[in-house]
């Protein structure tokens, strides 16, 4: 058996879904798919939430893919333990496995955590103003993964986060640059 998924507090479900369907395809190409039980585990309240409160038709589409490709899935679950031969979920279920790939939560980098003056949140991210300026130090700016992004939703059973991928990081970087230029010009 193969277990693919995302752990509690993870925020990059898309990459894990992509890995799931890539490995499913690879197993078919190797002519061994019928011999391998494939499991998807996720803290999401529903398939296709992606940490963005879903997309129109996403849940229906993913349920269809899970059925077509014979993928077992568990939603609203947390990982309690990864063992040599399985994954234990918070429900008490143990899914045996020979291979596991789990997307962990994003956390802040060590230099932020090791800089007490920056007052990082417990997850290692910085709490910033809407301009991406530090709330206390106006000469400190943050963008991308460094920024704490509050979720625009409430997880029902198991916590998970918003995605922090390349595009949002790129966009916050541009906003920071524009705000620095604006302030430097006295606007």
Segments and roles (model prediction):
Residues 25-128:
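A Rossmann-like FAD-binding core segment of flavoenzymes
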Residues 12-16, 48-54, 154-161:
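Short, flexible/disordered intra-domain loops and linkers
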Residues 25, 33, 165-187:
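Internal hydrophobic alpha-helix adjacent to the cofactor/substrate pocket in enzyme cavities
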Residues 1, 96-99, 103-171:
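FAD-site-proximal beta/loop scaffold in flavoenzymes
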Residues 1-36:
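Rossmann-like NAD(P)H-binding beta-loop-alpha module
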Residues 16-20, 59, 125, 166-169:
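Amphipathic alpha-helical segments in well-structured domains
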Residues 7, 43-45, 145:
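Cofactor-binding loop segments of dinucleotide-utilizing enzymes, especially the Rossmann-like FAD-
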């Amino acid at each position: 058996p193969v277990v693919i998924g995302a752990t509690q507090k993870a925020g990059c479900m898309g990459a894990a879904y992509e890995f799931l369907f890539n490995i499913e395809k690879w197993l078919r190409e190797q002519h061994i798919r019928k011999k391998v039980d494939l499991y998807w585990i996720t803290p999401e309240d529903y398939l296709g939430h992606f940490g963005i409160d879903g997309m129109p038709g996403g849940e229906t589409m993913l349920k269809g893919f899970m059925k077509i490709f014979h993928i077992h899935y568990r939603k609203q679950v947390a990982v309690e333990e990864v063992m040599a031969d399985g994954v234990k979920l918070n429900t008490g279920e143990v899914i045996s496995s020979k291979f596991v790939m789990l997307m962990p939560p994003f956390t802040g980098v060590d230099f932020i955590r090791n800089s007490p003056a920056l007052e990082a949140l417990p997850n290692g991210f910085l709490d910033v103003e809407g301009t991406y300026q530090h709330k206390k130090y106006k000469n400190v700016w943050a963008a991308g993964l460094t920024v704490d992004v509050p979720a625009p939703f409430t997880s029902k059973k198991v916590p998970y986060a918003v995605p922090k991928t390349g595009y949002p990081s790129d966009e916050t970087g541009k906003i920071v640059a524009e705000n620095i230029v604006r302030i430097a010009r006295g606007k």
